[in-house]
């Protein structure tokens, strides 16, 4: 992967036909498990709100693929008619997303530069972790 943030949304057959070898049925969650950092089957409109928020944050914050799959009948549901479960208190995240700044404070950067500049045989091993 090239580190681009991606939210992939795929469709599935009707929820009660999943896993029944229905015509052209594909387990898209399983299909995406090796490439997706976040991989969820959406079960209803309220669930879609939470997991879409999370998928966007994972894709942007971790710079990778987030995948949501939605059954055909779930796609036709209305948010206004769906109810949250008793365990779901509602919104859990901020309404805004802030990009992570991967830069040290200026004083630490200067201290590192001074340490490197004062060395006689300096070697730098650079890479980008996961």
Each PLM stretch: what is its role?
Residues 1-130:
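N-terminal alpha/beta PP-like core and its mobile active-site loop of ThDP/TPP-dependent enzymes
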């Amino acid at each position: 992967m090239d580190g681009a943030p991606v939210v992939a949304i795929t469709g599935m057959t009707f929820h009660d036909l999943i896993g029944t070898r229905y015509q052209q049925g594909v387990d898209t969650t399983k299909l995406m498990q090796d490439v997706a950092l976040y991989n969820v089957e959406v079960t209803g409109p309220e669930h879609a709100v939470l997991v879409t928020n999370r998928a966007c944050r994972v894709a942007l914050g971790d710079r990778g693929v987030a995948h949501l799959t939605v059954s055909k009948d779930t796609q036709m549901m209305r948010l206004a008619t769906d109810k949250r479960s008793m365990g779901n208190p509602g919104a859990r995240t901020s309404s805004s997303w802030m990009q992570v700044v991967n830069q040290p404070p200026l004083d630490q950067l200067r201290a590192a530069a001074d340490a490197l500049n004062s060395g006689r045989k300096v070697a730098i091993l650079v890479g980008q972790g996961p």
